Each structure stands twice: as C-alpha cells, then as structure tokens.
C-alpha cells in the first residue's frame, strides 16, 4: 500500500527551503562548498568586532559572518602581478555565495579577502554582511 511521506528537509523528493540563518550558513559552508570545490570550507564564524567593518545602510548590524578556506580553488591556479596585488581572485567565489544566499531568500553583500598566514599564504575569508530584512526576520523567528 502507498504510504505518503511527510514533507521534510531530509526528504530528497520533497526538499524544503531552509528559513533559518544558521542552518543556511552551515549548508553553504558544507554542502555547497563540497559540490563546488570537493571539500567543505575550513571555518565558519561570526565576528562582532565593530571596528573591523564599515557601517553601511545596507548592512543589518556591525556583525559579519565569515567562511574561511585555507586552500582556495581559484587562487591555486592563478598568479596575480605585483601591481595588482589588491585583486582577490576569490571574488568569483564570493559572487557564487552571494547568489546562493540571494536565491535562498537571504540577501547579503559578500566580499572576498585574502588573509595570509605563514602556513596558508592564499587563505581567503568570504565576508557576509546580511541585509537588514534578514536580521529582522531572524529576530521575529526567535533568533539572535
């Protein structure tokens, strides 16, 4: 006899779009990153250091979510001339993340920044500044 399956996010035949911010960011950090690059991103964190970010009308608060990858895909195969060292070739990755978040209903301004370390000279942080509407919705749903 035919059993009707309950609609849930874990049902691949009837997936639901996630409406909570943290779960969406975790999806980008793991699932989307694995599909695009073959491995999950190295780190997902939230910064609340107000002196690190420019205040803008678009941004919800002076907090930002960051996805870090120690060995970014596009930086591996490209060499940037010294006169263009401010160029971040991972801006393409930031655009993909921004498009994914926009498509999921989480508008944000997403940028890429190289944060070199001795161990990882191409280490890149994808900085996510969410739209005010996202944070208002998250607060209304009982989030942070």
Model segments located where?
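A generic structural signal for short, solvent-exposed coil/turn residues
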Residues: 52, 102-104, 118-120
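N-terminal accessory segment detector
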Residues: 1-87, 133-144
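Beta-rich nucleic-acid/ligand-interaction surfaces
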Residues: 112-128
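Intrinsic disorder
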Residues: 84-91, 120
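Eukaryote-biased feature marking scaffold/signaling PDZ-domain proteins and nuclear chromatin regulators
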Residues: 92, 105, 121-123
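A broad, low-specificity signal marking well-ordered, structured residues that form hydrophobic/aromatic
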Residues: 58, 65-66, 108, 124-126
